[in-house]
Amino acid sequence: MVTGAGRVTENLLDQLGQKYNMTVIDPNADRGRTVAEKFPKVVVVNASANDVNTLKEEGIDGCGTFLALTGSSETNIVSCMVAREHGVRRTLARIEELQYIPEAESLAIDKIINKKLLNTGKVLSLVLDNNVATSQCLSLDKAEVTEIKVPEN
């Protein structure tokens, strides 16, 4: 189950939409229509991600993975909490406000994605590509940590 029918969801559906039974929930009818037209096998529901009744009707109780990808960090955190309460094993939330990340981690959200951090990691990978095996970047309010793994040679 995915909440939010934006570009991140469309990119995800490009990769996974045909392999899994997917339900996308979004209150914006135009975005929902676009996803439904582009991915006919995906069930699209025009509703809020915070509507617990809709989540139940769409089968959150039997859902293995819940992806909260709306443009609202707060909505994503709350909907992941609801998913956990309904027995969902894996949750992922898109959180754009960096100050929310530690709190979201303490709420047992399995994975957190943040465009700023992802982009920073990609830039580091590109800049250091020739001499670096992998790189990751974590940035919080008052600190930034960069992990770079350099191959032996």
Predicted region positions:
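Cytosolic regulatory regions of ion transport systems
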Residues: 1-153
